[in-house]
């Protein structure tokens, strides 16, 4: 009989503190330039691996359809273990918070932890299943370029004091594919400052410049009533859409959520 494992972990949501698109690539993807940050909103995953024939069973509190975890498991191509995943979704789906990508990263990290895949394989699988997934393998704070696969980890902003945010969750989701299709070339590269500059302003807690640099290109293609809500917040706080929406955030001293220094956190690991 082989070994069985149980891994319990949290996978944290992310914000794009700024998000610009620099152009469309020859492969059809868009070149992004962004500052990513994990926040304290998280999903919970309870993963059990035991001897079997390569089956994956996912149980969740919401209807997750053809989940990204299936794509990960297909690429792993393991035929001597069965996996059961209990997934408690707290991160809204389709809102630009990276919940599915964080789940995929958590699953990949768990499979690496038990020795089914190597660290090198982890990154390759992450790059194949979703543009945001590689970030969550590093987590915390990072400058992200390319189509999301170029990760430049930087010292977590949590090392420079507390940052808190409020999230605003409209009751509709926005298709990322559709949002990208609406972008116009003349909008590319128009962010007021670079992600590197914005990161430095966060480090020095220069909130006036943080407010100036909090930018998201996708605000150009969202419904007008949503944009008006963001701009109303922006009069007093750094505020923007995250991802392609529909969630938007505002940096506030009394915000409900905090910046966190990791994308995935293992809370329990059992071997039998």
From Swiss-Prot:
EC number: 2.7.1.148
Keyword vocabulary terms for this entry: ATP-binding, Isoprene biosynthesis, Kinase, Nucleotide-binding, Transferase
Swiss-Prot/TrEMBL catalytic activity: 4-CDP-2-C-methyl-D-erythritol + ATP = 4-CDP-2-C-methyl-D-erythritol 2-phosphate + ADP + H(+)
Alphabetized InterPro entries for the sequence: GHMP_kinase_C_sf (IPR036554), GHMP_kinase_N_dom (IPR006204), IspE (IPR004424), Ribosomal_Su5_D2-typ_SF (IPR020568), Ribsml_uS5_D2-typ_fold_subgr (IPR014721)
Pfam families per UniProt: GHMP_kinases_N
Positions that bind ATP: 92-102
Pathway membership: Isoprenoid biosynthesis; isopentenyl diphosphate biosynthesis via DXP pathway; isopentenyl diphosphate from 1-deoxy-D-xylulose 5-phosphate: step 3/6
GO biological process: isopentenyl diphosphate biosynthetic process, methylerythritol 4-phosphate pathway; terpenoid biosynthetic process
Single GO MF annotation: ATP binding
Catalytic residues (UniProt): 14, 132
Sequence similarity: Belongs to the GHMP kinase family. IspE subfamily.
Protein's job: Catalyzes the phosphorylation of the position 2 hydroxy group of 4-diphosphocytidyl-2C-methyl-D-erythritol.
UniProt-listed HAMAP family: IspE
Protein name: 4-diphosphocytidyl-2-C-methyl-D-erythritol kinase
Native organism: Fervidobacterium nodosum (strain ATCC 35602 / DSM 5306 / Rt17-B1)
Gene: ispE
């Amino acid at each position: 009989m082989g070994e069985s494992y149980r891994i319990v972990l949290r996978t944290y949501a992310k914000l794009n503190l700024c998000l610009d698109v620099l152009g469309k690539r020859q492969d059809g993807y868009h070149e992004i330039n962004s500052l990513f940050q994990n926040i304290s909103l998280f999903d919970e995953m309870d993963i059990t691996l035991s001897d079997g024939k390569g089956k994956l069973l996912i149980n969740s509190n919401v209807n997750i359809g053809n989940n990204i975890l299936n794509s990960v498991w297909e690429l792993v191509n393991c035929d001597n273990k069965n996996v059961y995943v209990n997934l408690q979704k707290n991160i809204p789906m389709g809102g630009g918070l990276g919940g599915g990508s964080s789940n995929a990263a958590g699953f990949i990290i768990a499979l690496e932890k038990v020795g089914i895949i190597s660290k090198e394989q982890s990154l390759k699988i992450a790059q194949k299943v979703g543009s945001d997934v590689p970030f969550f393998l590093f987590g915390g704070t990072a400058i992200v370029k390319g189509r999301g696969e170029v990760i430049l980890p930087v010292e977590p902003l949590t090392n420079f004091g507390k940052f808190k945010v409020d999230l605003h969750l409209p009751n509709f989701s926005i298709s990322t594919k559709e949002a990208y299709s609406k972008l116009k070339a003349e909008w590319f590269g128009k962010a007021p400052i670079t992600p590197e500059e914005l990161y430095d302003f966060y480090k020095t807690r220069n909130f006036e410049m943080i407010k100036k640099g909090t930018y998201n290109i996708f605000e150009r293609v969202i419904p007008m009533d949503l944009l008006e809500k963001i701009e109303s917040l922006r009069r007093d706080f750094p505020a923007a859409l995250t991802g392609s929406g529909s969630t938007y955030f505002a940096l506030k001293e009394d915000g409900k959520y905090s910046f966190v220094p990791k994308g995935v956190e293992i809370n329990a690991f059992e071997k039998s």
